[in-house]
């Protein structure tokens, strides 16, 4: 369908690569790129959010840009292996990564992020965990609440 649409004048949009990455369709992404389809940072962030490490790796190897939203996406999706790979390959992160983990509720991922120097805004993490009823994350947060200066 995509090939037919493109061959019949349907213009390329960045979203084509984003949706292919989000849904783990590596062959579609490869075909789209080979035929001139543009991409941007969202291609990597959506692959990460959905846990498609192979797609993310291919995108990066082939020059797709990424930013801190890639780590945030992996965090929200609860994909520790994806987050570890992104960080090992130079992807930036910030306090939003920990907020994303609290939103997604993966305690192991939150512990790994904090142990590896990811900044956080404790109150925001608590609010995300509470809003999404992640009791194990809340318990860990309360045990690890920063002391007031």
Map each language-model feature to its residues.
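Ankyrin repeat (ANK) tandem alpha-helical domains that serve as protein-protein interaction scaffolds
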Residues: 1-149
């Amino acid at each position: 369908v995509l090939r037919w649409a493109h061959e019949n004048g349907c213009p390329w949009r960045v979203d084509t690569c984003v949706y292919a990455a989000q849904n783990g369709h590596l062959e579609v992404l490869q075909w789209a790129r080979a035929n001139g389809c543009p991409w941007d940072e969202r291609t990597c962030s959506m692959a990460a959010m959905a846990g498609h490490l192979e797609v993310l790796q291919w995108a990066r190897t082939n020059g797709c840009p990424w930013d801190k939203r890639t780590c945030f996406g992996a965090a929200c999706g609860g994909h520790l292996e994806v987050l570890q790979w992104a960080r090992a390959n130079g992807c930036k992160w910030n306090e939003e990564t920990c907020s994303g983990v609290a939103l997604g509720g993966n305690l192991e991922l939150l512990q790994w992020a904090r142990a590896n120097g990811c900044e956080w805004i404790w109150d925001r993490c608590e609010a995300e965990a509470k809003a999404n009823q992640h009791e194990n994350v809340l318990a860990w947060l309360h045990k690890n609440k920063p002391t007031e200066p």
